[in-house]
A protein has these predicted regions:
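Acidic, contiguous internal or C-terminal segments within carbohydrate-active enzymes
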Residues: 1, 128, 150
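A contiguous, surface-exposed recognition patch within enzymatic or periplasmic domains that forms
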Residues: 1-123, 131
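A general sequence property marking short-to-moderate contiguous segments
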Residues: 124-139
Length: 166
């Protein structure tokens, strides 16, 4: 993942270096809201998937964005962080006091400071879908038709599928 302008770069979900001036050298799961102390953006680096999402462990629910990754390469999540400062924003910006995240997507560009222009009379078309989902946890793949989870543990494989309502 990287930040605005690709100035800071980190492995994801386990960060092992410095990202947003925070030392994660011990190996920290920065996909978990509670582990991120400062306001932070995560932008996906060359994702080969057609989805991006956010999952709330406490609520057992999440939101997915689905679009062709060749047309919609931009995948970003923003959080105010889990510090006292971030939790104050959570309280101000949510109905039930957080956590607050922004899921952002981009058509034709992979980073927020990048711009793609339309010429006079030019037209570009695309489709994108936002899907709420629940009870699956973090998923491995999604399309406009279904959300899929497959997880390997010492006891074997487990999984789940949630079809869309279209």
């Amino acid at each position: 993942v990287f930040d605005h302008g690709k100035r800071a770069v980190s492995a994801f979900p386990i960060a092992t270096g410095t990202y947003y001036k925070v030392d994660y050298s011990a190996g920290v799961d920065i996909s978990r809201y509670k582990n991120v102390p400062v306001p932070t953006s995560y932008m996906a680096e060359k994702s080969q998937y057609d989805f991006v999402g956010a999952w709330c462990h406490d609520e057992d629910g999440g939101l997915l964005h689905v679009a062709n990754h060749h047309i919609a390469p931009g995948k970003k999540q923003w959080s105010w962080g889990h510090s006292e400062f971030g939790q104050a924003w959570d309280k101000s910006l949510t109905d039930n006091n957080g956590p607050y995240i922004e899921l952002m997507t981009g058509i034709f560009a992979d980073n927020q400071p990048d711009f793609t222009w339309l010429d006079a009379y030019e037209e570009k078309r695309f489709e994108q879908y936002f899907l709420p989902y629940h009870s699956l946890g973090m998923v491995q793949n999604a399309s406009r038709d279904a959300v899929i989870k497959l997880q390997r543990s010492k006891r074997g494989l487990s999984g789940g599928c949630m079809p869309s309502l279209r």
